[in-house]
Amino acid sequence: GVDAIILADPGLMEYAKTKHPQLRLHLSVQGSATNYEAINFYHEQFGIQRAVLPRVLAMPQIEHVVKNTPVEIEVFGFGGLCVMVEGRCALSAYVTGDSPNTVGVCSPGKAVRYEQTAQGMETRLNGVLIDRFAESEKTGYPTLCKGRFEVNDETYYAIEEPTSLNTLELLPKLMEIGVKAIKIEGRQRSPAYVAQVTKVWREAIDSALRNRQNFSVREAWMAELNKVSEGNMHTLGAYYRPWK
């Protein structure tokens, strides 16, 4: 009863296409396909019917991809914010020795440590200090690209702050440009997290489908999403903001 298989490995795609031609194949975000030429290649070679875009594309770029491929396009709507091209980030592998493409996550739970010190709550990844939070600050999950580091004698978030991607306000626009599905991050998340976020997004999508022109984000939705947002902060990520 499986609806589709999500794959990133070309060898597995070829095997699935040959041995199970009736099976619907989706290209994983780990396939790092950021343009329509790459997506069309996977479609022509392996029959991919849907592709999940990495979280580094702006809205005009997403629209350009949608217009130039017969493949359904899926984008991330809520969850962790990855500022790298998924499948190609070497930061976490450098610190933990585990590649995101082989272990499935960029900060494996086994490498994560929280320690209360006199200076504040410290978060470490494989022993490396990633951040230190004051009592008044919300403690984020230790991800290397969201660490607070000393650069030119200043300590700050050099790449990105601990925050969650939330594109709820973009729903009408995503529908308008032809995006076919919204992806909610579930990897390293609890069933309760997935249920809570999915419930909010189901209500929002149904509301937008009924009346896209007058769609507005409800306070109750944001209140629920705030409970599971990293650092209680939201961002539109690359959709409407260039990286530093």
Q: Where would I find each of the regions flagged by the language model?
A:
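Long, charged N-terminal interaction/targeting segments
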Residues: 18, 40-41
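As written
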Residues: 47-48
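Active-site pocket-lining/capping segments in soluble small-molecule metabolic enzymes
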Residues: 1-33, 52, 60-181, 187-244
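Contiguous mid-protein beta-loop-alpha structural module that forms a pocket-lining wall or clamp
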Residues: 56
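Conserved nucleotide-cofactor-binding alpha/beta core module
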Residues: 35-37
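Non-catalytic positions within long, well-ordered alpha-helices that form the structural scaffold/packing
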Residues: 43-44, 175
